[in-house]
Amino acid sequence: MTMASRSFLTDRQAEELHKSIIAYLTSLNLATTANTLRAELNLPEETFDLAKAKQYEGLLEKKWTSVIRLQKKVLDLQAENAHLKNEIENAGPLALSRKNQDPANWLPKGPPRYTLEGHRLPITSVAFHPVFSSLASASEDNTIKIWDWELGELERTLKGHTKAVLDVDFGGPRGNTLLASCSSDMSIKLWDPADQYKNIRTLHGHDHIVSSVRFVPANGTAGAGGNLLVSASKDNTLKLWDVTTGYCVKTIEGHNDWPRAVAPSADGRWLLSTGSDKAARLWDIGGTEPECRVVMFGHENFNLCCEFAPSTSYPHLARLAGHEKVPPANSAAEFMATGSRDKQIRLWDRRGQCIKVLEGHDNWVRGLAFHPAGKFLISVADDRTMRCWDLSQDGKCVQTLSGMFDGFVSCVRWAPGITKDGLAGGDAGDGTPKKKTGAEANGGVQMRCVVATGSVDGTEGKVRIFAN
């Protein structure tokens, strides 16, 4: 067996290598070593004399330096490949998905994944379906549109209201998700997603514009199995409805002017309402009759939005409030937020004390959404921005999204989370079975890092989807 047969070189390549080595040894005046190698390789001097050896001088050194340069280039390419791979992973959906397996610090960033166009007039509200990748948007063009937010496609348009649709919300009895809408035509409509969004019921009773509607979570004493719906109207009242019968079961009075917005607590026992009287009211609906427990004053103009803080935010808000103890997680109405035409956001405790004023918006604050992990509060406003406030840093504004909205931003929603048992998590609270999607957060809840906004761009309304 020859040396060539034991290598990866062809016979021709091996012969050239041997001649280069002999020429190299000869150039170093190592004649004895060169002659010994000649004999071993059976290269007699008459077939490889000094004249031919001269042709191979320097060839071995050139080959060696070429190998070194090639090796360095390979190392450089490997480093560049690793860098590019890291950039792709940091920017691509797969990497973002990996990062958001712990989504506590995820915040919406531009550009949006989708900008959904189709409404002819401003958008007033958006709402996520608790199970599927469907999103409802309400508009002043009298319609509701259903979108697939994962694909960025329009699924259908719902017509039935005769004036501007002002709010939408998904919820309802266990296993029977419904869509509720309310309008300037003074009516509330219920739509069945399982039956091609058929309008199954229209609720009448308010004497003026109905501006806000929300399903009351099923796990409270007043929840009635997820059958309750609450509405707010320019007739200065809130109403509780049984969606299975369509009857108004309670009328709640107390506001001195239009209660523009209403939100239920996660346990279904409490309601938070706010509006044109510049006050926010905390209602206990767990008893036989609703009772106003706290009235919160402080805003200097009409209030436009309100939200209960999730229990995950209690550690941050308790510190802001100067409380020595963090409230228990099963207490659902410890802290609240309101947004106003005075350009401010106010954070409140359940005693009605304002614990923090968040300032930074340059126009009316239209919508609020707490981060499910509790660390951040998201707000949108007529200054064409979305702001992110870090509650762990005394409410510091840590991010402002601007330049991507062409007009007033009227609403914002965070997609509801999903618990390990497949039921609605977070603030969705409608008891509807849900499939597991998104990253898993603490407490056995899978958090979906998806945020939707509605705005007016020119005269048209646009929905924007921000997702990991």
Curated annotation (Swiss-Prot):
Its GO biological process terms? cell division; establishment of mitotic spindle orientation; microtubule sliding
Keyword Cell cycle in annotation: yes
Listed GO molecular functions?
Answer: dynein complex binding
Q: What is its main location?
A: cytoplasm
Location of the LisH domain: 13-45
UniProt KW keywords: Cell cycle, Cell division, Coiled coil, Cytoplasm, Cytoskeleton, Microtubule, Mitosis, Repeat, Transport, WD repeat
What is recorded about the protein's domains?
A: Dimerization mediated by the LisH domain may be required to activate dynein.
Q: Which family does it belong to?
A: Belongs to the WD repeat LIS1/nudF family.
Assembly and partners are described as: Self-associates. Interacts with NDL1 and dynein.
Please identify the protein, giving its name as recorded: Nuclear distribution protein PAC1-2
Gene source species: Podospora anserina (strain S / ATCC MYA-4624 / DSM 980 / FGSC 10383) (Pleurage anserina)
Organism taxonomic ancestry? Eukaryota, Fungi, Dikarya, Ascomycota, Pezizomycotina
